[in-house]
Amino acid sequence: MNLVRTAMLLAFMTALFMFVGFLIGGRGGMMIAFLIAAGMNFFSYWNSDRMVLAAYRAHEIDERNAPEFFAIVRDLARNAGLPMPKVYLYDSPQPNAFATGRNPENAAVAASTGLLQALSPEEVAGVMAHELAHIQNRDTLTMTITATLAGAISMLGNFAFFFGGNRDNNNNPLGFVGVLVAMIVAPLAAMLVQMAISRTREYSADRRGAEICGNPLWLASALGKIARGAAHVPNEDAERNPATAHMFIINPLSGERMDNLFSTHPDTENRIAALQEMAQSGMNVSTGPVRAVNPTRKSRSVPNTGRGGSQPPRGPWS
């Protein structure tokens, strides 16, 4: 189903590029736009995960510089029956995390320094289990490509303005009015592409994540802390790249509060309630607790991401 959804997104992006090309340069512009869109789609499939990680200046970590965090992800991946993903850390005081990659064999999980500082090891395990669930459900392909394409769509309005805004452009079949329409429609289309990613995937990933880590309450507690942190601590990189907001476990943008048609995430309280109900039902989970997560084990420090040459503040694992 995710492959079909991804194909539909790619087709929509191509059609939108062709439409704007038609507004700017008629049939010739439409053909040029088609070639550009085809190239972007090919590039996005193979490189969109790298682009997202680069946008947040994430640094890959291993068991040498982040042994406790790396061990948590390793044991969770084993519980889920997944290949070991690459593990990244990005420097942000806002607690949050995301997963990316076109398939389980080429996947990565990323957490903020703020996440490791604010959450206990058990809560971090719940968050990482959620992200691994996205990888296992193959949500990451759709999520990553959507982030890249939505960002490109939002640029189409500016493209039309600079290259098609000439009132005397005889190649533009709809004239200046058509360009103005494109400037309005393109950002709206970017939002609709993000809305095309069903919010039910978050509930599914929450449930599967609870099964992977072995305790729904770990993730429930983490969601509450992350939501409170995201509401008060800005993520400047996310504000500059709003098309990636739907990739995070909690929306990183300011002003995201309501569980409605225009939200990229379900309401956090609803997600927590579902996890608490799962725990109260006594439902047997498919895997046991992660062996690496033990309240008596403490990490030495939050790893240095290498940004600015400064060591992030030490967190509760210290």
From Swiss-Prot:
EC assignment: 3.4.24.-
InterPro entries from the UniProt entry: HtpX_protease (IPR050083), Pept_M48_protease_HtpX (IPR022919), Peptidase_M48 (IPR001915)
Region described as Disordered: 284-318
Superkingdom: Bacteria
One annotated GO biological process: proteolysis
Subcellular location: Cell inner membrane
Keywords in alphabetical order: Cell inner membrane, Cell membrane, Hydrolase, Membrane, Metal-binding, Metalloprotease, Protease, Transmembrane, Transmembrane helix, Zinc
Major site of localization recorded for this protein: membrane
Residues given in the record as Zn(2+) binding sites: 130, 134, 202
Membrane topology: Multi-pass membrane protein
Active site: 131
CC per GO annotation: plasma membrane
Membrane-crossing segments per the record: 6-26, 28-48, 145-165, 173-193
Cofactor(s) listed in the protein's UniProt record: Zn(2+)
Single annotated GO MF: zinc ion binding
Segments forming a coiled coil: none
Cofactor binding annotation: Binds 1 zinc ion per subunit.
Enzyme class: hydrolase
Entry similarity comment: Belongs to the peptidase M48B family.
HAMAP family the UniProt entry points to: Pept_M48_protease_HtpX
Protein name, entry field: Protease HtpX homolog
Species of origin: Rhizobium etli (strain ATCC 51251 / DSM 11541 / JCM 21823 / NBRC 15573 / CFN 42)
Lineage summary: Bacteria, Pseudomonadati, Pseudomonadota, Alphaproteobacteria, Hyphomicrobiales
